[in-house]
Amino acid sequence: MAKGSTRGAGSLRGSWLVSGVVTCACLMAALALSGRGSKAYTAYSLAVHKTKAIPAFARKYGLPCSACHTAWPELNAFGQAFRDRGYQLGNDRDSPIWQNPSYIPVTFRMTPNLHRESATKQAVDAVPGDGTSGLVSKTITQSGFDLSGMDLWTAGTLYKNISFVLLPSSDNTGAFHFEAAFVRFDNLFSNRWVNFKVGKFELDNLISEKRFLFLSGNGGAYQGYHFLPAGDVNDFGLGDNQIGAELSGHSENSYTRYGIALLSSTDGEVNLPTNQGYDAFLTLSHAVDVGSLGVERLGAYAYLGRRPTYFQTSVGTPIPGTGTGNKPFYRIGLAGDFFFGDFELLPFVMHASDDAYLATGTAANVALPPGARDARWNSGFVEAHYYVNPQLVFTGRWETVRMSQQADPTLPSDLGNIDAYSGGIRWYPIMFSRAGLSWHTEVSAVRTRGSAFAATDNVWTTSLFSGLDFDF
């Protein structure tokens, strides 16, 4: 289904109204309620801050899940520090040699659900089944019971100060791949500022797309993390796990953190499908504890990459891994994680640029189209969570993507612009060291500028989602 679509005008207004009302209600309720006597969860109790949960850690250390999580799968400040230490608390239980032989640090996660997806201004045959009847604009709607993909996540320590993650993950048909797989050497030279890992891992984004509280078809990804302008052949996504090596470090409480990663230019794909190039990702963040309000964190990041524009060929067929004519791109910006009692605010801004050859899909050994230039855009979002208690969370998010310069000057300046809205409720009837269950309900809507019929069309995609997100 095309990414940006619409329905009839009445249906369009209705779906947008529902999304807007839910999002605004969540945000306004949070703002109003957060002014009450704060039950602020700090790094030392049921803190409100951010990873994928693994109940095996709670079993291993005899801790409640709330010791590391605001609302599973988000980590709080204590959970962030636990992860930064290589899934270690600094006691005798860190090394697996002290564990019962029957202990296996593994978690399964899946979400049976009921959802409805709708997309406007989709190109369909005027007469179904007749490819010669011409194309007309229609709204496509699907609904029914479904399954999510499945994560089989295991992580922990191979030995003291040697940690690992292995995450085989499948789509909802059962087709598996490795979402993450790495080994990390912690506290090298007895120094918490020197940790080194190699493998496939999530970029050290302050706001993690792998651990956030949205699951629907339109709300379950950050638009700005994956946006590319029309005609761009770059494959990079800031939310995609990458393959490479990372040097990182942190203060004792992980309030100050840095990361430097050297990555293959493959966007996380195995078998070196593109070229022999490398990308770099740099992050730096600092947090302060402001007492009853919580822990406030601000971070900066920069991703500097290159992608090939053409390949060596054999009898006209591209040879994998021989990409050349590399051209640069970058993503830079700021992100925050701020608490006001039980209200959490997550702002994010990004400036992005892709070289003209990438943005126009032109091989570097031929001339650019007349007037071609680098594509540039800005994106951002504001996400809000209100934690009524450790078992009930209201969520809301607004996102925007705005082109500042099209690679092709003949294109409308706003082609590809995005506005996205999401809101939802997440209730945890159970969450303990053996298993967790969340009833997740969400509504999301995305408006994209430009359709198959006109560059000035506004195309809407909407999602209504309710599911049982469980792990054990």
Over which residues does each language-model region extend?
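The canonical Cys-X-X-Cys-His
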Residues: 62-72
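Local sequence-structure signature of Cys/Sec-based thiol-disulfide redox active-site neighborhoods
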Residues: 52-64
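Short, P/G- and charge-enriched loop/turn segments at secondary-structure junctions
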Residues: 95-96, 232-233, 319-323
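Outer-membrane beta-barrel pore domains
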Residues: 181-185, 189, 292-472
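Short, glycine/acidic-rich beta->alpha junctions
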Residues: 49, 174-178, 239, 276, ...
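Post-cleavage N-terminal segment of exported redox proteins
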Residues: 2-51, 74-112, 250-252, 262, ...
